[in-house]
Amino acid sequence: MSKNLFEECEKCLHDEPAASTAWCPVHVDVPLFASEMEKGDFKKAYQVLEKKIPFTGIIGMICDHPCEKACVRDKLDRAINVSELERAAVRYGYTPFKKGPSMPKKKGKVAVVGGGISGITAAFELDRKGFQVTIYEQSERLGGRVWDYEGKRISREAIEEELQIIERLGIKVSYDSRIGEEELEQLTEEYDAVYLGTGEWEKGLYIHPDTFQVFDSPLFAGGRLYDKSGSVIYAVSSGKRAALSMERYIKKISLTASREREGSFETSLNYQLGDVEPAPRIEKIHDVYTEDEAVREAKRCLKCRCSECVKTCSHMQKFNVTPKGYGRQIQINESVIMGTRYANKMINSCAMCGLCAEQCSLGIGMKDLIHETRESMVEKSKMPPSAHDFALKDMEFSNSNRFFMVKPPPGDKKAEYLFYPGCQLSASCPEYVEKAYRYLLSSVKEGVGIMLGCCGAPADWAGRKDLMRESIERFKNVWNETGKPAFILACSSCIGIFEKYLPEISYVSLWEIFQKYGLPETAKPEHRHILNIHDACGTRHKKEVHESVRKLASGLGYEIEELKYAKDKTKCCGYGGLVYYANREQAIDFAEDRIRESKADLLVYCAMCKDLFVSQGKRTFHILELIFGENPEDAARKKMPNLSQRHANRAGLKTRLLRELWGEEPEMELMERNELNLVIPQELWKTMEERYLLLEDIEQVVARSRISGERFFNPEDSSYLASLRIKNVTYWVRYAEKEGEIHVISAYSHRMEVVKE
């Protein structure tokens, strides 16, 4: 598998920090903090602060909030008032510091000169790392300029309570210790590392901007010695970062490795405001937000996170994954040699529609990775047979003699075009395929032949490279044998296959042909209602297809209202990627998600889109119903044929075309059916659909059992139970014979083979 595709997934921005978090020098998770505040859980909000900020009861009250300058909301109205939210979290969620289990002290002792904000932060961090710490403070109390805020933003009692943390940790403090140049030099000899946080120093110091080391020595410095702005939170940051450097220095490891994102930095996350409505900042009535005010202000936070692809994808929402997480789960799944591959169902539930790449600012998408993964699963014999078996058998049927056909125009005229309607349109609306071909014969003077069959999309989606190669070779052979005509395509999946695998063959959509040669006379324009167009995901980048369908609908008198996700941003109906067969529940989620977006009736130009939307109760028109339908309004609720009818419709289309246009009778294989008078209850038809059982499967089981006599008889109800293995599936049918009719009672299938002795 391609390493590059996994590397692309790793570039996913979903886990990138919000701009406010990135610009906060200690990287408080602002969205998480705001989320807890919004819920009114002030204790949890306080804990979020406490994870990044020591002496939270002090710093939370006096933080100078540089994060607000980076707040994305500031581009719309005003930044979130993080400063006041912090103060509210301290006021309503304050929890006294709890000393954790004491760590064994490491071989190493450090000194901290200056008991101000950066100094006590460095001491706190170094103690947590297990070092023996001594603070040298020139005055009689710790805190430094914290005391400047006494009575203004914080009480004396609150300051004293928080500063007791130093004593409770057992950190030594030497008060009234004035340290000058000479004393500092002695400390650097006595201790393994020394932190200088005095705010001022008589001699100029070169402090490394990343490590806070002073020259190449055991001395480190921060606070106002490094940042002249006097920022409280930057003082905290410098103390934390210097403590890490001191630990590395003592351990004799790199001071600079893996430190690119310490301190303030610009995130790669580019949060889109999109439809976000302005919301005025909540103003406080008293010195601190009330609980209600804090909750309302926290609600203004956008909780910035890149979820553009997830927001539009039912699949990623259902499995709770992002491209990065998806890629990692695939790697784990691929590495399993023995045991269960838990990601198989997820991998087979992706529609491979490509919307994720369109939504991503970096163009990261799952389509190609999922495709390669499925191919890999097939090659390693790890693809569950049940996932795509029916779809591949359906494709096999479409390319068998029962449907496949290539014919020149009647009268053996030369054809510059070859009409290829595809297998699904022929199964869902065979009458419109026939009408469309008759239209082409009468309107396109260059001559139009016809080819029936399946383009191979199911094989491509299923990761079956062998079957896909056969399909491509079939197309190339037909194209060469018929004089290299241009194909007229009526299926968006076919368009996708031609774009991907057959670049040498020119094609045009049926909708563009209608636009070029004009609509049939029966399609009379009249004033009609509003429609929302759902673009097929297979035509995502085919602007000419999008425009031609819209012009056709407008020409027929319909008013078009665009969906939010249209054209190159369209969503999948739920059939793409064979999701309909691998995970029916996921396919329905796709369909319902799209339906929720539409307020008017839908207009589609893909047969499966039509069938899936109607199956979920949405009035939906296929463009051919508007062009050829005698009563288009009735067609909006026309339900999809069942699986057995779809086979019959394809075979019937071929039969009619051969007889009516060429005066030919179909081959015997096409006409061969078991002469059985089967009676199947409606409820059983539904079960057969859910279990992918075809009428012809039932017929074969019953017919074979009656001929061979291999069946079980139940004297209680005079019913028979028979089985038959067809290829890789064993079918079971329970039936009863009554007055010349065969009443089918139940049917099911499995992949186990019944061995007869």
Where are these regions (language model features)?
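C-terminal amphipathic alpha-helical segment
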Residues: L519-G555
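Local cysteine-cluster metal-coordination motifs and their immediate loop/turn environment
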Residues: E7-P31, F55-L76, K299-K318, N348-G363, ...
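Ferredoxin-type iron-sulfur electron-transfer modules and their immediate structural context
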Residues: M1-S102, A193-S349
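Short, charged, surface-exposed secondary-structure boundary motifs
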Residues: R145-V146, L205-I207, Q515-T522, K571-C573, ...
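Cofactor-cradling patches in redox/metallo enzymes
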Residues: E150-K152, Q424-S509, R540-G557, E561-L657
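Ribonuclease/tRNase effector modules and their secretory precursors
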Residues: R637-Q645, N649, K654-E757
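Iron-sulfur-cluster electron-transfer modules
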Residues: A34-D192, G197, N320-P503, S644-R659
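Conserved beta-strand elements of the Class I
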Residues: A111-V113, F220, L418, N532, ...
